[in-house]
């Protein structure tokens, strides 16, 4: 079929030469053309099967490679979707961790503020208690020294009951 198409095509190309009215009787164009067509036909006859099988194998290789690439593309798209999903989950988890850390930091701050406040109050109470104790101690020492001075001076006489009453009133 191909050979017939070639011959027809060749004749169509030669038809303008025939219509010009040139004298081509002295040329061997027809013999050369027939030899060329015969050569192409024989070449086609012997190489057509090999050429077809070669082209088929190449097209099969190309289609296999295309299928492999499409499979890889599909896997890549699935991996991309999976990784994007994991990224979103990681972002949500990070936001949750940050919010929990902020809450925990606030709670720890409140705890330490409360503990510090209690410690300060305890220190104030303890210092007041120590001051009261020191005041009582100083009063007692003062009263004792005054009584001692009064007893040693012997200008004033006290009995034991009077000393007890004075001490009860002052301390």
Swiss-Prot record:
The keyword Membrane applies. One of its GO terms (cellular component) is plasma membrane. It comes from the Bacteria. Keywords: ATP synthesis, Cell inner membrane, Cell membrane, CF(0), Hydrogen ion transport, Ion transport, Membrane, Transmembrane, Transmembrane helix, Transport. It is a single-pass membrane protein. InterPro entries: ATP_synth_B-like_membr_sf, ATP_synth_b/b'su_bac/chlpt. It is found in: Cell inner membrane. GO terms for molecular function: proton-transporting ATP synthase activity, rotational mechanism. The keyword Iron does not apply. Its main location: membrane. The chain crosses the membrane at residues 2-22. F-type ATPases have 2 components, F(1) - the catalytic core - and F(0) - the membrane proton channel. F(1) has five subunits: alpha(3), beta(3), gamma(1), delta(1), epsilon(1). F(0) has three main subunits: a(1), b(2) and c(10-14). The alpha and beta chains form an alternating ring which encloses part of the gamma chain. F(1) is attached to F(0) by a central stalk formed by the gamma and epsilon chains, while a peripheral stalk is formed by the delta and b chains. Belongs to the ATPase B chain family. F(1)F(0) ATP synthase produces ATP from ADP in the presence of a proton or sodium gradient. F-type ATPases consist of two structural domains, F(1) containing the extramembraneous catalytic core and F(0) containing the membrane proton channel, linked together by a central stalk and a peripheral stalk. During catalysis, ATP synthesis in the catalytic domain of F(1) is coupled via a rotary mechanism of the central stalk subunits to proton translocation. Component of the F(0) channel, it forms part of the peripheral stalk, linking F(1) to F(0). This is ATP synthase subunit b.
